[in-house]
Amino acid sequence: MAPPPPAAPPCPGLTELALRVARRIQAGGAPDGNLVFSPLSVYAALALVAAGAGGDTLAELLGVLGAGSRDELAGLAGRLAGRALADRSRAGGPRVSFVSGVWYDKTRTLSPSFRDAAVQSFMAETRAADFREKPGEAVNQINAWARKATNKLIDTVIDGGLPADTDVVVANAVYFKGKWKDPFTKALTKTGKFHRLDGAAVDASFMQRGTYYDTGDYIACHDGFKVLRLPYDDERRRSPASPPPPPSTPRFSLCVFLPDALDGLWDLLDEIASTPGFLQAKLPTRHASVGELKLPKFKLTFSGDIAGVLRGLGLDATFSDGEADFSKMVEDDGGRRPLSMRSLVHKAVIEVNEEGTEAAASAINMVCGMSMTPEPRPVPVDFVADHPFAFFVIEETTGAVVFAGHVLDPSSTAGALDDDDDDDEFVVMGCLRYLLDRCMAFVGV
């Protein structure tokens, strides 16, 4: 039986932001670079920032986030943190960690309304720090929080120091580890050729299913592309007599969008980004009879300041000294200049292998080669990802895009804007996981 249809996105702005940010990051980075990032983390961080914004800055943030008010954003954050991102590892499901924190210089005072929103809606910790006299100690405190919050899986949210005039730091960390519901057999993994956009071919390790293998995988065939959905295990094995889990139980999948043309990725991504509802509408919802299934193992990293990307989406005042309005974040002491956001630093790591990954998935569409009756046997569907493709990790009950990216060369770990060669420390014992951490510094101008 097919699972219940996934819900519409909790806020269309989340999906739209995911697609727009992905295209702008790629446009500003290496043209042949891979990409992984967490739209959900960026969205949640900006939503928390909006809780302390006013005037044109708030209007900009609401416009980019696709929301009508601060209250709407706070409600969305609460639903996601309490439902979609609830940790289900004790029940046999994915291990999820989603945490936020706000640090402010001890000479500042957070406004009560912002503090309440941060704690109650965003479930964030708020702490005073000595950014002026002991900036190194403050950075260590923030990084220690990240390590504790993620069981040492995320080591730092701040690399190096902070600007001397830092007043507020907002940090968020997301971690997801899931095992495939139907794991790949390691013995079937073989080296093959992956065709890059420049026409060159590189060696890659392809995970495979057996020929004509009836799996728990989902494949949808569309004009010019196919979509593969690989569900992650969401619970311990139950006896046949056990009742099914409630519909609200979080479910995650990895969704791979593969163009038919070897060089068709950019056209496909443009179509996804420009057509409202396209992403969810094209996801498969029924099992497929698979002929040949090949997906390369890959590990991607990303590290970079995406403030410029967000400026390009319309956050001009937000990142402009003298124009930003964060008057709702701290109390006015009469002698301090207003706050301005200088940067949004984003880091992400993903590794995919035979055992699992990080997951989120959803949607509905017609699937090729499937039938609800045993006869006639469905025509097997091939899905051979031997050329550039896009991927999305989606939480199905909410439609939230937790992670997104694309693979242009599975033999390379570096992503667009990636400037950090030390991200391997985030991946432990070869387990499949997404790791993401990002921080934002608010500084007085």
From Swiss-Prot:
Keyword field: Protease inhibitor, Serine protease inhibitor
Any matching Pfam family: Serpin
Superkingdom per UniProt: Eukaryota
Keyword Transmembrane found: no
Location of region: RCL: 356-380
A single Gene Ontology CC term: extracellular space
InterPro entries reported for this sequence: Serpin_dom (IPR023796), Serpin_fam (IPR000215), Serpin_sf (IPR036186), Serpin_sf_1 (IPR042178), Serpin_sf_2 (IPR042185)
Sites annotated Reactive bond: M370, S371
GO MF annotation terms: serine-type endopeptidase inhibitor activity
CDD domains membership: serpinP_plants
PANTHER family: SERINE PROTEASE INHIBITOR, SERPIN, SERPIN-Z5-RELATED
Family label: Belongs to the serpin family.
Domain topic, free-text comment: The reactive center loop (RCL) extends out from the body of the protein and directs binding to the target protease. The protease cleaves the serpin at the reactive site within the RCL, establishing a covalent linkage between the carboxyl group of the serpin reactive site and the serine hydroxyl of the protease. The resulting inactive serpin-protease complex is highly stable.
Function: Probable serine protease inhibitor.
Protein's name according to its UniProt entry: Putative serpin-Z5
Organism: Oryza sativa subsp. japonica
